[in-house]
Amino acid sequence: MTVPDARKDLLVVNMGPHHPSMHGVLRLIVTLDGEDVIDCEPILGYLHRGMEKIAENRTIIQYLPYVTRWDYLATMFTEAITVNAPEELGNIQVPKRASYIRVIMLELSRIASHLLWLGPFMADIGAQTPFFYIFRERELLYDLFEAATGMRMMHNYFRIGGVAADLPHGWIDKCLDFCDYFLTGVVEYQKLITRNPIFLERVEGVGFIGGEEAINWGLSGPMLRASGIQWDLRKVDRYECYDEFDWEVQWQKEGDSLARYLVRIGEMTESIKIIQQALEGIPGGPYENLEFRRFAGTKDSELNDFEYRFISKKPSPSFELSKQELYVRVEAPKGELGIFLIGDNSVFPWRWKIRPPGFINLQILPQLVKRMKLADIMTILGSIDIIMGEVDR
């Protein structure tokens, strides 16, 4: 038996799982030939918390605080998809005012997510300055969230049939002021970054994905639109009231890391356009919160009442999920966030399958980094934009 010659000069290194550039607890086993990447294997699961199984033992209103822990930088989208599923299952109509408020919150959340992508991405490729700049705008955004929802992150704001509370007095003017200020901030980022020769050297032509290849891998969001595919669920599905606003799908045809950066920068400007139109055209009427009305209709248990002893054993009043199945999706900052829901004539879902965009976008990483340099791994991984909370669930 002849033993094949083993190459002695290949080096296997671990990147992560607790490295600042890993964007969470991601571990990469990288095989190197000098500086060239021969192979890369992502190791997942360090942040797995059984989110799908938890959903099967909770009513929707009980489960809402959990979903903000998937993508903890864009929590409004996880809340939106969680209430959209039972709304479609039960044919629940959302009032126009509540729909406008949802769109405003979703787009503010998209900007917050893209900002917190931009800073670490620039830090990954060696530019520290934008990392500190993004926190100015992010702080203003979180002030708006706190005023409207009571929380800076993990907002728990969306409800079946509407939102938890109406916008407070003066909030709309404050938000319009932020929009005007933020547009100047985006111009500043573009001056600082977009034509910077060192930045272009690091990202141009790095991590190329063609349009057909992107579709075959099931990519979505900026990863797909940067490869020349004009696919945005806000235009395709027309959920909430996006079709009432004038805005453009941001896309590029180059398919490299620079194109993905340009798509996200453009999306922030488009989000501001949507928010301004929604704020100026927001109608009156109810913001609706069906769960609150359901709670208000229940009898308060007396201290010595028979029911009081069993109050912790009873599920909170909620909607029965009819015995059918459906798939709902929204255009999250990272791509298509979907829920496959199976009802069983119970207040608990029979199956709650999460389709996270980060998990599917991450699958192409080993192919993108092959035959690239070691330093390009951080550029490519950063341009994909993953959050391990939603990857591992």
Curated annotation (Swiss-Prot):
GO terms for biological process: photosynthesis, light reaction. Its EC number is 7.1.1.-. Its main location: plastid. Keywords: Chloroplast, Membrane, NAD, NADP, Plastid, Plastoquinone, Quinone, Thylakoid, Translocase, Transport. It is an enzyme of class 7 (translocase). It is a peripheral membrane protein. NDH is composed of at least 16 different subunits, 5 of which are encoded in the nucleus. This is NAD(P)H-quinone oxidoreductase subunit H, chloroplastic. The lineage of its organism: Eukaryota, Viridiplantae, Streptophyta, Embryophyta, Tracheophyta.
